Structure formats: C-alpha cells, structure tokens
Amino acid sequence: MKKIFAVYYERDVNELGQLYPKIEDRQFNEVLFDIRDTLAKKNIDFVLITRQNPYVGNGEFFGYWQPGDNFCYKKVDELIKPDLIHDKGHIDFSDGFLNFFNSHDFARLGRNKYTQAVLAEGFIPRTCLVCSEKGYDKVLKNIKSEQIVAKPLDLNGGNGVTLYNRNNLNENQSFPIIMQEFVETSGGIDGMVNGRHDIRLYIIDGEAVMCSIRQPKEGGWLSNTHQGGTIHFYNKSEINPELLKFAQPVIEKFDQFGGKFYSIDFMRGNDGWYMIEMNDRPGMPAFFQDTNGAVKEFHEKLAAMITKELA
C-alpha cells in the first residue's frame, strides 16, 4: 500500500482549483507539483490539505485536494489519513496521531524570532525584546548602530520589518517586537555576490544541502522576493566554506528541537558572518528556477528524507 505525504496550508483552494491564483506566485504553485512528481518515482502519493478539510481525529481529515491539470487541484470528499505531514500553516491541533515533518516544539521556535535570537546568541546581531515604548531606552543603550531594524516576532517574508534611525524610533509601533543592530552587507562576498544580500541555507536532516542568494532591488535593503528582491540557487559544493563553518554550530543548536527540514538565513557584514533568522517552513524552489542542477538535487534529497521518514 502506498504511503501518503501531505502538505497542509492555512489557506483556501478557490472555485477554479487554484491554491495560488496570482501569476507572481508561480513558484508556490509549481513546487508542489514538482514534489508530487519526485515522490511518485518513489511510490509515494502526494496530497494537499487545507483549512477547508476539517480534522476529525485519529490522524484523519475529511477531504483533501488531488493535484490535477494546469497546476490546479481536484476536491476529494472522503476521509484521508496521511502518513507524514509538512505543515505550511502552523497546525495548532494534535491528538498525538499526526506525524509531522518538524516537531511542534520546532514550529513554535520558528514563530518566535526572539527565542531564536536567545538560542543563537553570539551568531546573530545584537537583539533586544521590546514590549512597550519604555523599552527604547534599553535598545539605545545596547545597540550602537546608527540604524536599527524592527521585526515582528512571528512574521516572515520581510512583512512588518522596518528600518529606523536610532534618533527616530517609531512611537506608534505594535508590540512586542525585536529590535536589532543593522548590519551593512554592501561589501558582498568574494566569489559569490556583489552588494547587499542574504544567503539562505536549506537544511535537511542536519545538513546544508543547497543555498540561495537573494539581493534587494536597487536602492533597497530587504531581499525577500515578495519585496522585489532577486534569487539564485546553488548546490552545496558552491556554498562559501567559511559560511558552512560558521553555520554548523547554529544548525546543531536548532536540530536539537526536532527540525527535519528548515532554512537559516545568513549575511556577511564588514566584520564577519551573522545569522539573520530561522524559518521552519521555508518556501521551496520549483524546477523552472533551476539553472545549474541545484534545485533538482535539492528535491531528490528532500524526497530521500521523506522516504526515510516513511519507512
């Protein structure tokens, strides 16, 4: 009997069977079909489960979405019991019968940037937790950079991230937030990238298997693709060895919380490497973004890990 691998999203499939109907979201549509095709070679079924499919207990959901033609899904109204779930929506229910890619402890860690900063102290820019305007005095005392980055604790994709001058911190900020030292990355990385950047390492079973280099649009500082940044992918042999050495103890810190697949973002400042943050449910590249075989190799390693987890 075939094993079932499911990806769960906290969003709806529309009446046309589309999960991501916008053209600019092509990556998020196609990557799921790429995963389906890769897993099919290993005799594993892929299904999509969304918040439209209620959990009924004992590891079962009522209804699921079967990949169809033209990157659309067909609704199936029957019970399904996935053998393994990749949670892209932060499922907050479990009766002990659901088997997740990453543990719940790891998912909670992914939702709290301050907890990540405490765990990665010494690897991450100087960080302060700010719960009210009274916390600004602590920020100015501990962070010396002229510019200061403010981030919500639980958002990704550059959403809610703001850059302030230290003399003009926003009194209308929503709390709690973290505030961090701003690290200038315009010096780039020899042999890899010129100018401002961040580098994302994709971690599978404790190993950095691929990286992406993202750069902001001209004049910008946020490199997230939804913020107008560009992205290119590289296989492990192309990753800067200094970064791999710097990243290894960081990976070990996060692995102890039960992460099987995740990403960590890094940057190189004028005085060395820094971790930015960990993402417990990173966006995955689709085959159409592959220019050098790195994405195909990533999918094969991901499928191998899924196969091992289902054995």
Please name every model-derived segment:
Residues 200-201, 263-265:
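Short, surface-exposed charged micro-motifs
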Residues 241, 255-261, 268-311:
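C-terminal active-site "lid" helix and adjoining low-complexity regulatory extension at the edge
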Residues 148, 209-210, 274-277:
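Protein kinase-like catalytic core scaffold
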Residues 91-97, 102-192, 244:
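Active-site nucleotide/adenylate-binding loops and adjacent lid/helix of ATP-dependent enzymes
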Residues 7-24:
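Short glycine-rich His-centered loop
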Residues 1-6:
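Extreme N-terminal starter segment of soluble prokaryotic enzymes
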Residues 23-131:
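Conserved N-proximal alpha/beta basic substrate-recognition cap immediately N-terminal to
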Residues 157-238:
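Phosphate-binding site of ATP-dependent enzymes
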